[in-house]
Structures are given as C-alpha cells and as structure tokens.
Amino acid sequence: MRILGIDPGLARVGYGVIETAGREQTMLDCGIIRTDSGRPEGERMVEIARDLRQLIRAWKPELAAVEKFFFYRSSNTIAVVQARGVVIMTLSRFGLPIVEFPPMQIKQALTGHGHADKDEVLEAVMRELSLETPPRPDDAADALAVALTGWFQR
C-alpha cells in the first residue's frame, strides 16, 4: 500500500510517501511544499493545492494520513487550520481515503508513549524506514511519522 503523510502548515506543508509490503515499509519521497510569506494567504493556499495535486498524480497513493489539530490559540494557528482545510479538500477531490491523527496518537504509534519528544519520534521513523540519515526538514520527517501511523493504525 502506498501512503501519503501530510504535516499541514501555511509556510511549509511537510509530505512523506511510503510504500508498505507485509511488515516492510520503504520511504519513496519526502519534502516540503513551501509558500512565500510575502504573498497573500489565498495565493499561498492555491499553491499548496497545486503542488499537492502534483504529488498525488506522481505517487498515486492509496491512503492519505493527515496530522489533526485540536487547539486554536492564535491568528497564525488559524492560517494553519485553513491550509489544512485546503489539504483535506485536495485529497478528497482525488477520492483518497483520509485518516487523521492528533500528535499524541502519532507519538504513541511510533514510540509506545504519547509524550515522546521530537528526537524519539525521529529515531522511530528512521528505524521503521531503515534510514541511515534523518529525513529533512523536520516537517518532512513529521509527515513520514504521520504516514507510518496511517499504516500502523489501518
């Protein structure tokens, strides 16, 4: 199964694509969709949707896993939530099944406890995907963690 993991954001959307076969998981791609902070939010969201469509067409995932947020405390967070809505809409337009996980559930799935720090999650991602070097940037590594959680929680 091919899974696209997404770590939503307005400035950077992390993505990670994994392929699973039996008990093996392989990283196919990871990176970020970066938007220019000097452009209007609407244009940035159009850019996110466009680049995400390209990723979906290129990798043809069978499942999308997206990090879910629960707390909205600042105007910056509102923009992230809006960008997440663009991600969900774009995935839905391709008819992809979508699973969503809050950060604590992702940490639990990868490390066995929901209060893991970033380094513990990164180590788990590297172990599960047999990576010798950490995926960069952090948003891409986070997206791979989301994709792995999608696989583990299926």
UniProtKB/Swiss-Prot annotation:
Q: Does the UniProt entry include the keyword Nucleotidyltransferase?
A: no
Q: Where is Mg(2+) 1 annotated to bind?
A: 7, 139
| Domain of life per record | Bacteria
Required cofactors, per record? Mg(2+)
What keywords were assigned to this record? Answer: Cytoplasm, DNA damage, DNA recombination, DNA repair, DNA-binding, Endonuclease, Hydrolase, Magnesium, Metal-binding, Nuclease
Q: How and how many cofactors are bound, per the record note?
A: Binds 2 Mg(2+) ion per subunit.
State what protein this is by name.
Crossover junction endodeoxyribonuclease RuvC
